[in-house]
Protein backbone atom coordinates (compact mmCIF):
# COMPACT_ATOMS: atom_id res chain seq x y z
CA UNK A 1 0.00 0.00 0.00
CA UNK A 2 2.79 2.38 0.98
CA UNK A 3 4.75 1.43 -2.15
CA UNK A 4 1.72 2.11 -4.36
CA UNK A 5 1.23 5.51 -2.72
CA UNK A 6 4.91 6.38 -3.15
CA UNK A 7 4.78 5.35 -6.81
CA UNK A 8 1.61 7.39 -7.29
CA UNK A 9 3.20 10.47 -5.78
CA UNK A 10 6.27 9.83 -7.91
CA UNK A 11 4.25 9.77 -11.13
CA UNK A 12 2.36 12.94 -10.18
CA UNK A 13 5.60 14.60 -9.12
CA UNK A 14 7.32 13.64 -12.37
CA UNK A 15 4.38 14.99 -14.36
CA UNK A 16 4.41 18.28 -12.46
CA UNK A 17 8.18 18.54 -12.81
CA UNK A 18 7.93 17.91 -16.55
CA UNK A 19 5.22 20.54 -16.91
CA UNK A 20 7.22 22.96 -14.77
CA UNK A 21 10.35 22.46 -16.86
CA UNK A 22 8.37 22.93 -20.08
CA UNK A 23 6.93 26.18 -18.73
CA UNK A 24 10.36 27.36 -17.58
CA UNK A 25 12.05 26.70 -20.94
CA UNK A 26 9.21 28.49 -22.75
CA UNK A 27 9.11 31.58 -20.50
CA UNK A 28 6.11 30.26 -18.55
CA UNK A 29 3.86 30.24 -21.60
CA UNK A 30 1.01 27.75 -20.88
CA UNK A 31 0.57 27.34 -24.65
CA UNK A 32 3.82 25.33 -24.61
CA UNK A 33 2.26 22.55 -22.52
CA UNK A 34 1.44 19.45 -24.55
CA UNK A 35 -1.80 18.86 -22.63
CA UNK A 36 -3.00 22.39 -23.42
CA UNK A 37 -2.23 22.05 -27.13
CA UNK A 38 -3.68 18.54 -27.26
CA UNK A 39 -6.90 19.62 -25.51
CA UNK A 40 -7.30 22.61 -27.80
CA UNK A 41 -6.78 20.41 -30.88
CA UNK A 42 -9.20 17.76 -29.62
CA UNK A 43 -11.87 20.40 -28.98
CA UNK A 44 -11.40 21.81 -32.50
CA UNK A 45 -11.64 18.36 -34.12
CA UNK A 46 -14.84 17.57 -32.21
CA UNK A 47 -16.23 20.98 -33.15
CA UNK A 48 -15.50 20.42 -36.85
CA UNK A 49 -16.95 16.90 -36.76
CA UNK A 50 -20.14 18.13 -35.08
CA UNK A 51 -20.41 20.97 -37.59
CA UNK A 52 -20.48 18.49 -40.48
CA UNK A 53 -22.87 16.15 -38.67
CA UNK A 54 -25.18 19.00 -37.68
CA UNK A 55 -25.06 21.12 -40.82
CA UNK A 56 -24.56 18.64 -43.66
CA UNK A 57 -24.97 14.98 -42.70
CA UNK A 58 -28.19 15.36 -40.72
CA UNK A 59 -30.24 14.19 -43.71
CA UNK A 60 -29.97 12.33 -47.01
CA UNK A 61 -29.14 14.68 -49.89
CA UNK A 62 -29.34 14.31 -53.63
CA UNK A 63 -25.66 15.02 -54.21
CA UNK A 64 -26.23 16.26 -57.75
CA UNK A 65 -28.47 19.16 -56.72
CA UNK A 66 -27.25 22.78 -56.54
CA UNK A 67 -28.64 22.98 -52.99
CA UNK A 68 -26.36 20.20 -51.75
CA UNK A 69 -23.30 21.65 -53.47
CA UNK A 70 -23.97 25.12 -52.03
CA UNK A 71 -24.54 23.73 -48.53
CA UNK A 72 -21.41 21.58 -48.69
CA UNK A 73 -19.36 24.60 -49.80
CA UNK A 74 -20.74 26.65 -46.91
CA UNK A 75 -19.91 23.93 -44.35
CA UNK A 76 -16.42 23.44 -45.82
CA UNK A 77 -15.84 27.17 -45.34
CA UNK A 78 -17.01 27.08 -41.70
CA UNK A 79 -14.80 24.05 -40.97
CA UNK A 80 -11.80 25.66 -42.67
CA UNK A 81 -12.19 28.84 -40.58
CA UNK A 82 -12.34 26.77 -37.38
CA UNK A 83 -9.14 24.94 -38.33
CA UNK A 84 -7.46 28.23 -39.24
CA UNK A 85 -8.24 29.57 -35.74
CA UNK A 86 -6.63 26.48 -34.18
CA UNK A 87 -3.59 26.80 -36.45
CA UNK A 88 -3.04 30.46 -35.58
CA UNK A 89 -3.29 29.79 -31.83
CA UNK A 90 -1.04 26.69 -31.76
CA UNK A 91 1.33 28.12 -34.40
CA UNK A 92 4.57 26.36 -35.38
CA UNK A 93 4.02 22.96 -36.97
CA UNK A 94 0.31 23.65 -37.32
CA UNK A 95 1.06 26.62 -39.58
CA UNK A 96 3.40 24.46 -41.66
CA UNK A 97 0.65 21.90 -42.28
CA UNK A 98 -1.85 24.70 -42.98
CA UNK A 99 0.52 26.15 -45.58
CA UNK A 100 0.80 22.73 -47.19
CA UNK A 101 -3.00 22.54 -47.42
CA UNK A 102 -3.05 26.04 -48.92
CA UNK A 103 -0.74 24.86 -51.71
CA UNK A 104 -2.86 21.87 -52.81
CA UNK A 105 -5.11 23.90 -55.07
CA UNK A 106 -6.33 21.04 -57.25
CA UNK A 107 -6.27 18.29 -54.65
CA UNK A 108 -8.46 19.56 -51.80
CA UNK A 109 -11.77 21.47 -51.60
CA UNK A 110 -11.21 25.08 -52.66
CA UNK A 111 -12.74 26.41 -49.42
CA UNK A 112 -9.89 24.86 -47.40
CA UNK A 113 -7.22 25.89 -49.91
CA UNK A 114 -8.34 29.53 -50.12
CA UNK A 115 -8.73 29.85 -46.34
CA UNK A 116 -5.25 28.46 -45.64
CA UNK A 117 -3.52 30.57 -48.30
CA UNK A 118 -3.41 33.50 -45.87
CA UNK A 119 -0.76 31.57 -43.93
CA UNK A 120 1.75 31.97 -46.78
CA UNK A 121 2.07 35.68 -46.05
CA UNK A 122 0.49 36.41 -42.68
CA UNK A 123 1.93 33.88 -40.25
CA UNK A 124 1.99 35.13 -36.61
CA UNK A 125 5.29 36.75 -35.57
CA UNK A 126 7.29 36.72 -32.31
CA UNK A 127 8.68 39.68 -30.33
CA UNK A 128 12.28 40.55 -31.15
CA UNK A 129 13.37 39.75 -27.57
CA UNK A 130 12.35 36.09 -28.07
CA UNK A 131 14.58 35.88 -31.13
CA UNK A 132 17.50 37.51 -29.34
CA UNK A 133 17.21 34.79 -26.72
CA UNK A 134 17.56 32.08 -29.41
CA UNK A 135 20.62 33.87 -30.85
CA UNK A 136 22.24 34.05 -27.39
CA UNK A 137 21.54 30.37 -26.69
CA UNK A 138 22.85 29.11 -30.04
CA UNK A 139 25.73 31.49 -30.84
CA UNK A 140 26.83 32.00 -27.20
CA UNK A 141 27.08 35.77 -27.54
CA UNK A 142 24.85 38.83 -27.53
CA UNK A 143 23.40 39.99 -30.86
CA UNK A 144 25.17 43.35 -30.34
CA UNK A 145 28.51 41.57 -30.60
CA UNK A 146 27.70 40.32 -34.12
CA UNK A 147 25.43 42.96 -35.62
CA UNK A 148 25.89 46.70 -36.03
CA UNK A 149 22.14 47.01 -36.61
CA UNK A 150 19.18 44.64 -36.46
CA UNK A 151 15.77 45.76 -37.79
CA UNK A 152 12.96 45.00 -35.35
CA UNK A 153 10.30 44.61 -38.05
CA UNK A 154 10.70 41.25 -39.83
CA UNK A 155 11.13 40.98 -43.59
CA UNK A 156 8.87 37.96 -43.41
CA UNK A 157 7.36 35.51 -40.95
CA UNK A 158 6.86 31.84 -41.72
CA UNK A 159 5.64 28.80 -39.84
CA UNK A 160 8.99 27.84 -38.33
CA UNK A 161 10.95 31.10 -38.30
CA UNK A 162 11.05 34.78 -39.10
CA UNK A 163 13.63 36.75 -41.06
CA UNK A 164 15.11 40.14 -40.15
CA UNK A 165 17.42 42.47 -42.04
CA UNK A 166 20.68 43.26 -40.23
CA UNK A 167 24.20 44.56 -40.78
CA UNK A 168 27.24 42.63 -39.57
CA UNK A 169 30.07 44.31 -37.69
CA UNK A 170 32.11 43.68 -40.85
CA UNK A 171 29.68 45.84 -42.85
CA UNK A 172 27.77 43.28 -44.95
CA UNK A 173 23.98 43.47 -45.18
CA UNK A 174 22.49 40.13 -44.19
CA UNK A 175 19.15 38.39 -43.71
CA UNK A 176 18.94 36.65 -40.33
CA UNK A 177 16.57 33.70 -40.09
CA UNK A 178 15.73 32.77 -36.50
CA UNK A 179 13.60 29.80 -35.53
CA UNK A 180 10.56 30.50 -33.36
CA UNK A 181 11.64 29.50 -29.83
CA UNK A 182 8.65 27.24 -29.18
CA UNK A 183 8.73 25.21 -32.42
CA UNK A 184 11.33 22.53 -31.74
CA UNK A 185 10.09 21.77 -28.22
CA UNK A 186 6.47 21.43 -29.35
CA UNK A 187 7.08 19.62 -32.64
CA UNK A 188 6.91 16.03 -31.39
CA UNK A 189 3.70 16.38 -29.39
CA UNK A 190 2.14 18.48 -32.18
CA UNK A 191 2.77 15.78 -34.79
CA UNK A 192 1.36 13.10 -32.47
CA UNK A 193 -1.69 15.28 -31.87
CA UNK A 194 -2.27 15.82 -35.58
CA UNK A 195 -1.89 12.12 -36.27
CA UNK A 196 -4.51 11.37 -33.62
CA UNK A 197 -6.86 14.05 -35.01
CA UNK A 198 -6.58 12.68 -38.55
CA UNK A 199 -7.30 9.14 -37.33
CA UNK A 200 -10.40 10.33 -35.44
CA UNK A 201 -11.71 12.29 -38.44
CA UNK A 202 -11.06 9.32 -40.74
CA UNK A 203 -13.26 7.15 -38.51
CA UNK A 204 -16.08 9.69 -38.58
CA UNK A 205 -15.71 10.50 -42.29
CA UNK A 206 -14.43 7.50 -44.29
CA UNK A 207 -13.64 9.77 -47.27
CA UNK A 208 -11.26 11.84 -45.12
CA UNK A 209 -7.91 10.30 -46.01
CA UNK A 210 -4.98 12.63 -45.42
CA UNK A 211 -2.71 10.26 -43.52
CA UNK A 212 -0.18 10.91 -46.29
CA UNK A 213 0.00 14.57 -45.23
CA UNK A 214 0.80 13.67 -41.61
CA UNK A 215 3.35 11.05 -42.71
CA UNK A 216 5.12 13.55 -44.97
CA UNK A 217 5.09 16.22 -42.26
CA UNK A 218 6.58 13.79 -39.71
CA UNK A 219 9.33 12.86 -42.16
CA UNK A 220 10.14 16.39 -43.36
CA UNK A 221 9.79 18.41 -40.17
CA UNK A 222 13.07 17.37 -38.48
CA UNK A 223 14.89 18.20 -41.73
CA UNK A 224 13.29 21.65 -41.95
CA UNK A 225 14.06 22.39 -38.29
CA UNK A 226 17.80 22.04 -38.96
CA UNK A 227 18.92 25.33 -40.50
CA UNK A 228 22.43 23.97 -41.08
CA UNK A 229 20.85 21.51 -43.49
CA UNK A 230 19.14 24.45 -45.20
CA UNK A 231 22.50 26.15 -45.63
CA UNK A 232 23.99 23.02 -47.19
CA UNK A 233 21.02 22.75 -49.58
CA UNK A 234 21.51 26.37 -50.65
CA UNK A 235 25.16 25.79 -51.47
CA UNK A 236 24.39 22.54 -53.31
CA UNK A 237 21.73 24.05 -55.58
CA UNK A 238 23.90 27.12 -56.25
CA UNK A 239 26.68 24.79 -57.41
CA UNK A 240 24.34 22.65 -59.53
CA UNK A 241 22.98 25.67 -61.42
CA UNK A 242 26.03 27.92 -61.57
CA UNK A 243 25.70 27.79 -65.39
CA UNK A 244 22.65 30.07 -65.05
CA UNK A 245 23.93 33.60 -64.56
CA UNK A 246 20.34 34.74 -63.97
CA UNK A 247 19.90 32.60 -60.81
CA UNK A 248 21.01 33.92 -57.39
CA UNK A 249 21.10 31.90 -54.19
CA UNK A 250 22.08 33.80 -51.02
CA UNK A 251 25.58 33.16 -49.66
CA UNK A 252 25.64 31.53 -46.20
CA UNK A 253 27.65 33.02 -43.32
CA UNK A 254 28.55 29.79 -41.51
CA UNK A 255 30.41 31.57 -38.71
CA UNK A 256 27.11 33.02 -37.44
CA UNK A 257 24.82 30.06 -38.17
CA UNK A 258 23.47 27.16 -36.12
CA UNK A 259 20.60 24.67 -36.26
CA UNK A 260 18.19 27.50 -35.25
CA UNK A 261 19.93 30.60 -36.67
CA UNK A 262 20.87 31.10 -40.32
CA UNK A 263 22.70 34.24 -41.44
CA UNK A 264 22.77 34.73 -45.21
CA UNK A 265 23.43 37.36 -47.83
CA UNK A 266 20.66 39.98 -48.08
CA UNK A 267 19.28 40.17 -51.62
CA UNK A 268 16.61 42.68 -52.58
CA UNK A 269 13.83 42.06 -55.07
CA UNK A 270 10.09 41.88 -55.54
CA UNK A 271 7.95 38.80 -54.98
CA UNK A 272 7.50 36.88 -58.20
CA UNK A 273 3.74 37.56 -58.12
CA UNK A 274 4.03 41.30 -57.34
CA UNK A 275 2.68 42.56 -60.66
CA UNK A 276 3.10 46.23 -59.68
CA UNK A 277 6.81 45.67 -58.96
CA UNK A 278 7.22 43.78 -62.23
CA UNK A 279 5.56 46.58 -64.22
CA UNK A 280 7.48 49.36 -62.44
CA UNK A 281 10.79 47.67 -63.16
CA UNK A 282 9.85 46.77 -66.75
CA UNK A 283 10.37 43.06 -66.13
CA UNK A 284 9.04 40.65 -68.76
CA UNK A 285 6.61 38.32 -66.94
CA UNK A 286 6.95 35.72 -69.70
CA UNK A 287 10.73 35.69 -69.24
CA UNK A 288 10.18 35.19 -65.49
CA UNK A 289 7.81 32.26 -66.08
CA UNK A 290 10.14 30.73 -68.67
CA UNK A 291 13.15 30.79 -66.36
CA UNK A 292 11.25 29.40 -63.40
CA UNK A 293 9.88 26.66 -65.67
CA UNK A 294 13.38 25.93 -66.96
CA UNK A 295 14.83 25.79 -63.44
CA UNK A 296 12.17 23.46 -62.05
CA UNK A 297 12.10 21.22 -65.13
CA UNK A 298 15.84 20.66 -64.74
CA UNK A 299 15.47 20.06 -61.01
CA UNK A 300 12.68 17.50 -61.42
CA UNK A 301 13.74 15.68 -64.57
CA UNK A 302 17.54 16.09 -64.64
CA UNK A 303 19.19 16.63 -61.22
CA UNK A 304 16.49 15.09 -58.97
CA UNK A 305 17.21 17.71 -56.28
CA UNK A 306 14.01 19.76 -56.12
CA UNK A 307 13.29 22.93 -54.13
CA UNK A 308 9.90 21.96 -52.73
CA UNK A 309 8.51 25.21 -51.34
CA UNK A 310 8.35 27.63 -54.30
CA UNK A 311 5.55 29.81 -52.93
CA UNK A 312 5.71 33.46 -54.09
CA UNK A 313 7.53 34.69 -50.98
CA UNK A 314 10.45 32.37 -51.72
CA UNK A 315 11.10 33.55 -55.29
CA UNK A 316 12.19 37.14 -55.91
CA UNK A 317 12.70 38.90 -59.24
CA UNK A 318 14.89 41.92 -59.87
CA UNK A 319 16.99 43.78 -62.40
CA UNK A 320 20.77 43.66 -62.08
CA UNK A 321 22.99 46.77 -62.47
CA UNK A 322 23.55 45.52 -66.06
CA UNK A 323 19.73 45.68 -66.54
CA UNK A 324 19.26 41.93 -66.97
CA UNK A 325 16.64 39.80 -65.23
CA UNK A 326 17.66 37.86 -62.11
CA UNK A 327 15.72 35.22 -60.16
CA UNK A 328 16.51 34.96 -56.43
CA UNK A 329 15.68 31.60 -54.85
CA UNK A 330 15.10 31.66 -51.07
CA UNK A 331 14.24 29.18 -48.27
CA UNK A 332 16.15 25.99 -48.97
CA UNK A 333 14.89 24.03 -45.98
CA UNK A 334 12.91 21.42 -47.90
CA UNK A 335 14.19 19.57 -50.97
CA UNK A 336 12.92 16.40 -52.60
CA UNK A 337 15.67 13.92 -53.46
CA UNK A 338 14.30 11.92 -56.38
CA UNK A 339 15.66 8.52 -57.34
CA UNK A 340 16.77 7.86 -60.93
CA UNK A 341 13.94 5.34 -61.36
CA UNK A 342 11.34 7.85 -60.20
CA UNK A 343 12.65 10.52 -62.59
CA UNK A 344 12.57 7.99 -65.44
CA UNK A 345 9.00 6.90 -64.69
CA UNK A 346 7.77 10.45 -64.15
CA UNK A 347 9.45 11.66 -67.36
CA UNK A 348 7.77 8.88 -69.33
CA UNK A 349 4.41 9.66 -67.71
CA UNK A 350 4.66 13.27 -68.88
CA UNK A 351 5.73 12.20 -72.38
CA UNK A 352 2.73 9.85 -72.59
CA UNK A 353 0.43 12.71 -71.50
CA UNK A 354 1.91 15.08 -74.08
CA UNK A 355 1.52 12.40 -76.77
CA UNK A 356 -2.06 11.61 -75.58
CA UNK A 357 -1.17 7.91 -75.25
CA UNK A 358 -3.69 6.38 -72.82
CA UNK A 359 -2.04 2.97 -72.73
CA UNK A 360 1.33 4.49 -71.82
CA UNK A 361 -0.35 6.78 -69.25
CA UNK A 362 -1.78 3.75 -67.47
CA UNK A 363 1.54 1.87 -67.67
CA UNK A 364 3.66 4.69 -66.26
CA UNK A 365 1.05 5.57 -63.63
CA UNK A 366 1.29 1.97 -62.41
CA UNK A 367 5.07 2.37 -62.20
CA UNK A 368 4.41 5.28 -59.81
CA UNK A 369 2.01 3.23 -57.67
CA UNK A 370 -1.40 4.09 -59.18
CA UNK A 371 -3.69 1.11 -59.71
CA UNK A 372 -6.39 0.55 -62.32
CA UNK A 373 -8.54 3.32 -63.75
CA UNK A 374 -7.26 5.93 -61.30
CA UNK A 375 -4.54 6.73 -63.86
CA UNK A 376 -6.89 9.23 -65.55
CA UNK A 377 -7.46 11.16 -62.34
CA UNK A 378 -3.74 10.98 -61.61
CA UNK A 379 -2.98 12.54 -65.01
CA UNK A 380 -5.38 15.38 -64.15
CA UNK A 381 -3.67 15.92 -60.79
CA UNK A 382 -0.22 15.96 -62.40
CA UNK A 383 -1.20 18.42 -65.14
CA UNK A 384 -3.79 20.51 -63.28
CA UNK A 385 -6.09 20.13 -66.31
CA UNK A 386 -9.45 18.31 -66.79
CA UNK A 387 -9.48 14.90 -68.46
CA UNK A 388 -11.19 16.30 -71.58
CA UNK A 389 -8.26 18.68 -72.07
CA UNK A 390 -5.69 15.93 -71.43
CA UNK A 391 -7.30 13.80 -74.14
CA UNK A 392 -7.48 16.68 -76.63
CA UNK A 393 -3.81 17.48 -76.02
CA UNK A 394 -2.41 19.95 -73.50
CA UNK A 395 -0.57 21.91 -76.17
CA UNK A 396 -3.68 22.26 -78.33
CA UNK A 397 -6.17 23.60 -75.77
CA UNK A 398 -5.52 26.99 -74.19
CA UNK A 399 -5.93 27.27 -70.43
CA UNK A 400 -8.93 29.37 -69.37
CA UNK A 401 -10.52 30.69 -66.20
CA UNK A 402 -13.60 28.60 -66.93
CA UNK A 403 -11.44 25.48 -67.05
CA UNK A 404 -9.87 26.36 -63.68
CA UNK A 405 -13.30 26.91 -62.10
CA UNK A 406 -14.57 23.62 -63.52
CA UNK A 407 -11.57 21.76 -62.14
CA UNK A 408 -11.90 23.28 -58.65
CA UNK A 409 -15.67 22.77 -58.52
CA UNK A 410 -15.30 19.11 -59.49
CA UNK A 411 -12.58 18.45 -56.92
CA UNK A 412 -15.07 17.89 -54.12
CA UNK A 413 -16.97 15.36 -56.27
CA UNK A 414 -13.91 13.14 -56.70
CA UNK A 415 -12.28 13.86 -53.34
CA UNK A 416 -12.50 10.21 -52.14
CA UNK A 417 -10.69 9.09 -55.31
CA UNK A 418 -8.09 11.86 -54.94
CA UNK A 419 -7.47 10.55 -51.43
CA UNK A 420 -7.02 7.04 -52.86
CA UNK A 421 -4.45 8.35 -55.35
CA UNK A 422 -2.51 10.16 -52.63
CA UNK A 423 -2.51 7.06 -50.43
CA UNK A 424 -1.26 4.83 -53.29
CA UNK A 425 1.26 7.02 -55.09
CA UNK A 426 5.03 6.81 -54.67
CA UNK A 427 5.86 9.03 -51.67
CA UNK A 428 8.32 11.02 -53.79
CA UNK A 429 5.36 12.24 -55.83
CA UNK A 430 3.75 14.12 -52.94
CA UNK A 431 6.27 16.96 -52.84
CA UNK A 432 6.25 17.11 -56.64
CA UNK A 433 2.45 17.56 -56.68
CA UNK A 434 2.77 20.37 -54.15
CA UNK A 435 5.58 21.97 -56.17
CA UNK A 436 3.59 21.68 -59.41
CA UNK A 437 0.60 23.42 -57.82
CA UNK A 438 2.72 26.28 -56.47
CA UNK A 439 4.39 26.82 -59.87
CA UNK A 440 0.98 26.77 -61.59
CA UNK A 441 -0.23 29.35 -59.07
CA UNK A 442 2.68 31.64 -59.99
CA UNK A 443 1.96 31.21 -63.71
CA UNK A 444 -1.71 31.97 -63.08
CA UNK A 445 -0.87 35.25 -61.32
CA UNK A 446 1.62 36.20 -64.05
CA UNK A 447 -1.01 35.23 -66.68
CA UNK A 448 1.47 33.09 -68.56
CA UNK A 449 -0.27 29.68 -68.52
CA UNK A 450 -0.75 29.57 -72.29
CA UNK A 451 2.91 30.11 -73.14
CA UNK A 452 4.18 27.17 -75.19
CA UNK A 453 7.75 27.61 -73.91
CA UNK A 454 6.92 25.98 -70.56
CA UNK A 455 5.84 22.76 -72.30
CA UNK A 456 8.78 22.93 -74.70
CA UNK A 457 11.38 23.20 -71.91
CA UNK A 458 9.70 20.48 -69.86
CA UNK A 459 9.35 18.17 -72.88
CA UNK A 460 13.07 18.54 -73.64
CA UNK A 461 13.98 17.69 -70.04
CA UNK A 462 11.65 14.66 -70.10
CA UNK A 463 13.22 13.32 -73.29
CA UNK A 464 16.76 13.88 -71.96
CA UNK A 465 15.93 12.23 -68.62
CA UNK A 466 14.27 9.23 -70.28
CA UNK A 467 17.16 8.58 -72.67
CA UNK A 468 19.80 9.16 -69.98
CA UNK A 469 18.22 6.38 -67.91
CA UNK A 470 18.00 4.10 -70.96
CA UNK A 471 21.70 4.66 -71.68
CA UNK A 472 22.54 3.89 -68.04
CA UNK A 473 20.67 0.58 -68.32
CA UNK A 474 22.53 -0.28 -71.54
CA UNK A 475 26.01 0.59 -70.23
CA UNK A 476 27.17 -3.02 -70.74
CA UNK A 477 25.66 -3.38 -74.22
CA UNK A 478 28.45 -1.77 -76.19
CA UNK A 479 29.11 1.62 -77.75
CA UNK A 480 26.92 1.01 -80.82
CA UNK A 481 23.78 0.65 -78.68
CA UNK A 482 24.65 3.81 -76.71
CA UNK A 483 25.29 5.67 -79.97
CA UNK A 484 21.91 4.54 -81.34
CA UNK A 485 20.15 5.83 -78.22
CA UNK A 486 21.91 9.20 -78.62
CA UNK A 487 20.77 9.40 -82.26
CA UNK A 488 17.18 8.62 -81.24
CA UNK A 489 17.36 11.25 -78.49
CA UNK A 490 18.59 13.87 -80.98
CA UNK A 491 15.79 12.92 -83.37
CA UNK A 492 13.14 13.24 -80.64
CA UNK A 493 14.51 16.67 -79.65
CA UNK A 494 14.54 17.78 -83.30
CA UNK A 495 10.89 16.75 -83.69
CA UNK A 496 10.03 18.63 -80.50
CA UNK A 497 11.67 21.81 -81.79
CA UNK A 498 9.78 21.54 -85.07
CA UNK A 499 6.47 20.90 -83.31
CA UNK A 500 6.78 23.82 -80.88
CA UNK A 501 7.99 26.09 -83.68
CA UNK A 502 4.81 25.15 -85.55
CA UNK A 503 2.63 25.84 -82.48
CA UNK A 504 4.39 29.17 -81.97
CA UNK A 505 3.75 30.15 -85.61
CA UNK A 506 0.05 29.44 -85.17
CA UNK A 507 -0.26 31.30 -81.87
CA UNK A 508 2.33 34.09 -81.91
CA UNK A 509 3.81 34.63 -85.38
CA UNK A 510 7.22 33.81 -86.87
CA UNK A 511 9.61 35.98 -84.81
CA UNK A 512 8.02 35.15 -81.46
CA UNK A 513 7.90 31.45 -82.35
CA UNK A 514 11.57 31.50 -83.31
CA UNK A 515 12.48 33.13 -79.96
CA UNK A 516 10.73 30.34 -78.08
CA UNK A 517 12.82 27.53 -79.55
CA UNK A 518 16.23 29.23 -79.87
Curated annotation (Swiss-Prot):
Q: Where does ATP bind?
A: 155-163, 177
The record ties this protein, via SMART domains, to: S_TKc
Tell where it localizes: Mitochondrion
- Tell me one Pfam family matched here: ABC1
Phenotype upon knockout is:
RNAi-mediated knockdown is larval lethal. RNAi-mediated knockdown in adults results in the thoracic muscles displaying abnormally orientated fibers as well as an abnormal increase in mitochondrial fusion resulting in mitochondrial dysfunction in ATP production, ROS generation and cell apoptosis. Consequently, adults display a held-up wing phenotype, are unable to fly and also display defects in locomotion. RNAi-mediated knockdown in salivary glands also results in an increase in mitochondrial fusion.
Q: Which GO terms describe its cellular component?
A: mitochondrial inner membrane
Output the InterPro entries linked to this UniProt entry.
Answer: ABC1_dom, ADCK1_dom, Kinase-like_dom_sf, Mito_struct-func_regulator, Prot_kinase_dom
Which keywords accompany this UniProt record? ATP-binding, Kinase, Mitochondrion, Nucleotide-binding, Transferase, Transit peptide
Q: Which GO terms describe its biological process?
A: lipid homeostasis; mitochondrion organization; negative regulation of mitochondrial fusion; positive regulation of cristae formation
Q: Name one GO molecular function term.
A: protein kinase activity
Q: Where is the Protein kinase domain?
A: 149-468
Identify which residues the record assigns to the active site: 309
Disulfide-bonded cysteines: none
EC number(s) per entry: 2.7.-.-
Q: What is its main location?
A: mitochondrion
What does this chain do? Essential for maintaining mitochondrial cristae formation and mitochondrial function by acting via YME1L to regulate the mitochondrial structural proteins Opa1 and Mitofilin. This function is likely to be kinase-independent. Functions in tracheal development and larval molting probably by acting in sterol modification and/or intracellular lipid trafficking. The action of this enzyme is not yet clear. It is not known if it has protein kinase activity and what type of substrate it would phosphorylate (Ser, Thr or Tyr).
**Belongs to which family?**
Belongs to the protein kinase superfamily. ADCK protein kinase family.
Q: What is this protein called?
A: AarF domain-containing kinase 1
